[in-house]
Amino acid sequence: GGTIASQEGEDGLEPKTTGQQMLDLIPELQGLCEIDCVDLLNLDSTNMQPEEWAVMAKAAFEGMKNHDGIVITHGTDTCAYSAAALDTMLTNPKVPVVLTGSQLPAGEADSDAAHNIHDAFLAACGAPEGVYLAFDGRVIHGLWATKIRTMGFDAFVSVNCPYAGKIADGKLMMQETAKEKTVAAATVESAVDVRLDSKVAVFKLIPGFDPVLLETVVDLGYHGVVLEAYGCGGITNYRRNLLPAIEKMIHKGMVVAATTQSTFDGCDLSQYEVGVRALKLGVIPAGDLTTEALVVRTMIALGRWTDKKDIEAFLRGDMSPVDRSVPLTAFIE
């Protein structure tokens, strides 16, 4: 983990605390379950990269063969990327795989580490099979988590998908949708697939964005681009027109996908002319997917397939079980 396992070093906080040292801070875990502790990595999450996603996915897959649940402590800054990666790399995991972290190091007074670790173990013991992030009393499906705070304990929210569950007064309560997903997948064989292509760039559009920036990635050997577009999927096509550069990328065989800069409600390129023209060129709309999830799935799609139809089908969003008439936070409030 990052912050959760950090201690003061020569140049600031750095990961040093072992898994067992963290567990020793939480006597409430005694009697809850039997724990095997593995120090898999000890990295600030800023330094977590696609190679580490593969390490975690393989370790989780091996661990679930003789355990009833998996807990992974992780730095918060890139935890949403790792959660999305594990959710995608692990097909139908047979146990709950639960990531967690903290905003203050485990050894500090008033740290949220013990609370979050305890909640993660409750989820690992009682949640349906799947990948989750447990944080500040909330359980989020792995693909739909995003970090919204740098310091507040309620650092993560579920985006465009109902919360999987909540933990209150030491009790885990799961949404029915999470249980239904498990029943539907019960006959699918469990597997791990860590293939990916990390040559993916992300561009956040801003007023005055220079199309030359998009053209550079073609010559640098990138295979995919994620565009953080405006609103429902607006991509500039006036004055500093981005469409010729996008057309060039697609003609060269690159995958170009679009999401929104807005946190909630997703991307729909079919609503406005500034989205429709990009859609006609072959830009893939990511629907409900967050930027983190889209980046991860683009890398994984490029690693698994060469056929654009397969990649597009994999990247198109709208996969979350969302009832737009019900607030996403209804279950946890």
Task: Tell where the protein language model's regions lie, with residue ranges.
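Accessory alpha-helical/coil subdomains and C-terminal extensions
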Residues: 2, 18-19, 24-29, 141-227, ...
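Short beta-strand segments
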Residues: 72-74, 98-101, 132-137, 204, ...
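Short acidic, glycine/serine/threonine-rich loops at helix termini
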Residues: 7-12, 83-84, 109-112, 142-147, ...
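Short acidic/histidine-rich motifs immediately flanking catalytic phosphotransfer sites
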Residues: 65-69, 220-223
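C-terminal non-catalytic interaction/assembly regions of soluble proteins
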Residues: 232-333
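ATP/NTP phosphate-donor binding region
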Residues: 2-62
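Internal gly/pro-rich beta-alpha loop/helix module
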Residues: 99-169
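Short Gly/Thr/Asp-enriched flexible loops that form oxyanion-binding sites at enzyme active sites
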Residues: 73-95, 237-245, 274
